[in-house]
Regions:
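Extended hydrophobic/aromatic segments used for targeting, binding, or gating
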Residues: 219, 225, 230-239, 243
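Acidic, glycine/proline-rich low-complexity segments that act as flexible tails and inter-domain linkers
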Residues: 20-69, 82, 89, 93, ...
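A short structural micro-motif
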Residues: 80, 98, 111-118, 207, ...
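Winged helix-turn-helix DNA-binding recognition segment
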Residues: 100-104
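Intrinsically disordered, low-complexity segments enriched in Gly and acidic/Ser/Thr residues
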Residues: 207, 213-214
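Short, structured motif recognition centered on aromatic/hydrophobic residues
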Residues: 71-79, 108-109, 198-206, 235-239
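Bacterial N-terminal signal peptides
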Residues: 7-15
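Bacterial N-terminal signal peptides that target proteins for export
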Residues: 1-5
């Protein structure tokens, strides 16, 4: 009996060690900055190959202000928003290897159809389909078309609807209608993404698109849903490489204002 218990205990130890090694391996996974190989990049621009290796692979993706999983989500959202299908395909693979599920990626594309436009989402669909086929992802691994929705925060929805009606009701009644349903009464209530993740990809897409006027509302919503100040700042850092320095610097003052206002309200 003692030998059986000892063997069971040893099995648990080995299992825990293996799981720890797997987790550590994921955390230390080398992220290639592009679908294009470093050798091919070097054949055109040795400096670009060096910056990609030193700044992106060896520095940016090793920073701990965002988890590898969240960093890949942010990057996929930014690339979809900027309609970069070749790089979307590469980073869909990175995201899957970093712990993002096929269901979450499916829902990210759905969400960004509204925030980056249908054509950008269709570009993402075409390349993601190929990745899913290669990895054997089947339809039953994807979110339902019409699932049971998350509970609605009635007070927040009332405030949102009144603000939208006041600001654009006379200008575009159709925009008011579709902003309510399907955007906030359906899309935002779908359970395939947590509210935090849904806000995370929205903020990332807005920063990547240079839509600074919309960042404040959605960043506040993201932080209400659990995004930290450090994570918010790191999204801007990630944007510098994947959406360009001008977009990062356009977003930085808006993000800073949100962080200052939230900090002041707590004192």
């Amino acid at each position: 009996m003692k030998s059986v218990l000892a063997a069971a205990a040893m099995s648990l130890v080995i299992s825990d060690f293996a799981n720890a090694e797997e987790t550590r391996g994921k955390a230390m996974m080398k992220i290639e900055p592009s679908a294009i190989s470093e050798a091919d990049i070097r054949s055109v621009s040795p400096a670009l190959a060096r910056f990609g290796r030193e700044a992106i692979t060896e520095d940016l993706w090793t920073r701990d202000a965002l988890s590898p999983r969240d960093r890949s989500v942010v990057t996929v959202a930014m690339l979809i928003a900027r309609n970069q299908p070749a790089e979307v395909k590469h980073y869909i693979d990175v995201a899957l290897d970093s712990g993002v599920t096929p269901a979450e990626l499916s829902e990210i594309i759905t969400h960004l159809a509204f925030y980056s436009g249908w054509p950008n989402a269709m570009s993402a669909v075409s390349v993601t389909k190929a990745v899913f086929e290669t990895r054997g992802v089947t339809p039953d691994a994807l979110p339902d078309a019409s699932p049971d929705l998350l509970p609605l925060n009635q007070e927040a929805e009332k405030q949102r609807s009144e603000t939208v009606e006041k600001n654009v009701g006379r200008i575009s009644p159709g925009l008011v209608k579709f902003t309510a349903d399907p955007l906030f009464l359906d899309l935002w209530q779908r359970p395939a993404l947590t509210p935090r993740d849904r806000s995370l990809i929205t903020v990332s897409a807005l920063i990547a698109s240079g839509q600074s006027a919309q960042i404040g509302y959605h960043l506040n919503r993201a932080m209400d849903n659990g995004l930290s100040a450090e994570e918010a700042g790191e999204i801007v850092t990630q944007a510098a490489f994947y959406a360009g320095w001008p977009n990062a610097f356009t977003a930085a003052p808006v993000v800073g204002e949100v962080l200052i206002n939230r900090s002041s309200s707590k004192t």
